[in-house]
């Protein structure tokens, strides 16, 4: 009985040590790309739709502009992330070869494809939110309110998800994402509204 308890205690200690030893920084690359992509998808697509709506309040025009922003943004995010992470990959490979006598530990290297896919997928998921919020609302002002409300909820959700996956403080992460999204949306909407008003 005593040996059984000792064995269970050892197993629990080993599990705790493994959890502590787990390097959460390994998640950082794709997590950073995913959070960045989601925020960009939410904010840029919503701002684009609201900006276009300031000039032409037709729901079809707003949806088409948002869809175009989704496709272009997802491609841009994926390509940019792939190039960026691949540059980092090459640098780390060269450094490993110098330090390890030509040996490369691939499991420690960032994945360009993973980062690019996460970025594009997250952007698309984020961009769908304002599209769906605006799709079934006929009144322009109600439509804008629905977009802002949906984007706000989505920003909080993505901030919470990023904090949970990265083992970071939930409140700080969610607040940072939400405030940043609001600021970006306000600036982009204000500028596009100004341009549309003055017909520049």
From Swiss-Prot:
Keywords for this protein: Ion transport, Iron, Iron transport, Membrane, Transmembrane, Transmembrane helix, Transport, Vacuole
GO cellular component: vacuolar membrane
GO biological process: intracellular iron ion homeostasis; intracellular manganese ion homeostasis; response to iron ion
Tissues where the protein occurs: Expressed in the vascular bundles of the shoot and the stele of the root. Expressed in inflorescences and at lower levels in leaves.
Record carries keyword Ion transport: yes
Residues annotated as transmembrane: 35-55, 63-83, 117-137, 144-164, 177-197
Localization per Swiss-Prot or TrEMBL: Vacuole membrane
Membrane topology, Cytoplasmic segments: 1-34, 84-116, 165-176
Molecular function as annotated in GO: iron ion transmembrane transporter activity; manganese ion transmembrane transporter activity
Any Pfam family matching the protein: VIT1
Topology of the protein relative to the lipid bilayer: Multi-pass membrane protein
Its biological purpose: Vacuolar iron transporter involved in the transfer of iron ions from the cytosol to the vacuole for intracellular iron storage. Involved in regulation of cellular iron homeostasis. Vacuolar iron storage is required for seed embryo and seedling development.
Note: Can mediate sequestration of iron ions into vacuoles when expressed in the yeast ccc1 mutant.
Family stated for the protein in its record: Belongs to the CCC1 family.
Protein name, per record: Vacuolar iron transporter homolog 1
């Amino acid at each position: 009985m005593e040996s059984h308890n000792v064995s269970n205690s050892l197993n629990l200690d080993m599990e705790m040590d493994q959890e502590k030893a787990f390097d959460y920084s390994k998640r950082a690359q794709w997590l950073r790309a995913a959070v960045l992509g989601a925020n960009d998808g939410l904010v840029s697509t919503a701002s684009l739709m609201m900006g276009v709506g300031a000039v032409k309040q037709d729901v079809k025009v707003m949806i088409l502009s948002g869809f175009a922003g989704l496709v272009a943004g997802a491609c841009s995010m994926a390509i940019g992330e792939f190039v960026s992470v691949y540059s980092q990959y090459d640098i780390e490979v060269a450094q490993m070869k110098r330090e390890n006598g030509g040996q490369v530990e691939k499991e420690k290297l960032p994945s360009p494809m993973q980062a690019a896919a996460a970025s594009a997928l997250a952007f698309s998921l984020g961009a769908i939110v304002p599209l769906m919020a605006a799709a079934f609302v006929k009144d322009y002002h109600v439509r804008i309110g629905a977009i802002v409300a949906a984007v706000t909820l989505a920003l909080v959700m993505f901030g919470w998800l990023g904090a949970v996956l990265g083992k970071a403080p939930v409140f700080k992460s969610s607040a940072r994402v939400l405030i940043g999204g609001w600021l970006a949306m306000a600036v982009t909407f204000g500028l596009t509204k100004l341009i549309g008003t003055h017909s520049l």
